């Protein structure tokens, strides 16, 4: 049987030369013995007749919206590398830097930077961890990042070293910290993050069961289960089989008829509770808020607008609340993880990655105009800095900070002194 070929080279092909080489370059094969337990990674189980797994949970609209909202918005924010000199002056690193080019444009041969960050953040939202295989050049610079399946990774502490064991079909490979870029959610030990979807399994299972119940209800022609009463008449085995065959449609089969004629004292009655009795709509509405809480997403961003004003009266305030309470932890984890795993040790303290949040913080035109005016008049931003945020070309002389000439110290108020030349 031909051995499978993989697009992601983990340096663990089964050929003897690859096996021998892997001992010297890393990623060596290991035997699939018992690995460490780092808590639940994914969601699996049953609730009644409903099967619960990762794919089924992602089909819940609330979960899909929460995961896609966080991952897509985080990936849309510009992520650049900055350099800080000895005087604490910062400037953006140009694309001659391999890491800056990788984070801004192409982290690997088949993904854009946005697609890579989107996939990594999605796994971080879903599993609480995201992993990428790091490829470096001879100088130690990162030149490629390939995302890995979080559910296939086992992280354990061996002595004082962290070992990443990755499983691919029947293959196992061990990697060192230098070879893996690790995004972690919050967790007990700091070794790995906790999986939101694993801890939300019960709540998600209720949502799955309610969807399955409604699906079966409407597939049955919106008819509740029926019981057929024969009165005091006792049927033989043959008669019972015949009655079941004749009346299986009335018990919820796909055949729809306008009139049924019941003879010999037969009668039907519904059993179980109706969707109205079970308050299905109220229960499903509660599950929307319940699942949104696991991801920290405001309910109004997943379609529950009943209490949207609690997050602010305007779109700017709601965006600010979403940024502060939901996106900021993910943004900080990205920046800190890049600093920890991807910045060379010789550049720590000099280089750092940072997101540009201006696009997300934009409000309406009137609010933006007032903000820009205040920043310009106070000298906190130059004209070209403000034009750059709107993708407008620079103006000659627009790189000089300015402020109102009549501003004077409060100690000079009521005097005829000229405004002091403070260099503004």
Curated annotation (Swiss-Prot):
Gene Ontology BP annotations: symbiont genome ejection through host cell envelope, long flexible tail mechanism
Keywords for the protein's UniProt record, in alphabetical order: Capsid protein, Viral capsid assembly, Viral genome ejection through host cell envelope, Viral genome packaging, Viral long flexible tail ejection system, Viral penetration into host cytoplasm, Viral release from host cell, Virion, Virus entry into host cell
The keyword Transmembrane helix belongs to this UniProt entry's keyword annotation: no
Recorded family membership: Belongs to the phage portal family. HK97 subfamily.
Locations listed in the record: Virion
NCBIfam families in the cross-refs: portal_HK97
Role noted for this protein: Forms the portal vertex of the capsid. This portal plays critical roles in head assembly, genome packaging, neck/tail attachment, and genome ejection. The portal protein multimerizes as a single ring-shaped homododecamer arranged around a central channel. Binds to the terminase subunits to form the packaging machine.
Subunit (UniProt): Homododecamer; forms a ring-like structure through which genomic DNA is translocated into the capsid. Asymmetry of the portal protein is induced upon binding of the large terminase and DNA. Interacts with the terminase large subunit; this interaction allows the packaging of viral DNA. Interacts with the capsid protein.
Identification of the protein by name: Portal protein
InterPro entries from the UniProt entry: Phage/GTA_portal, Portal_HK97
GO cellular component entries: viral capsid
Pfam entry (one): Phage_portal
Gene: 3
Naturally occurring in which organism (per UniProt): Enterobacteria phage HK97
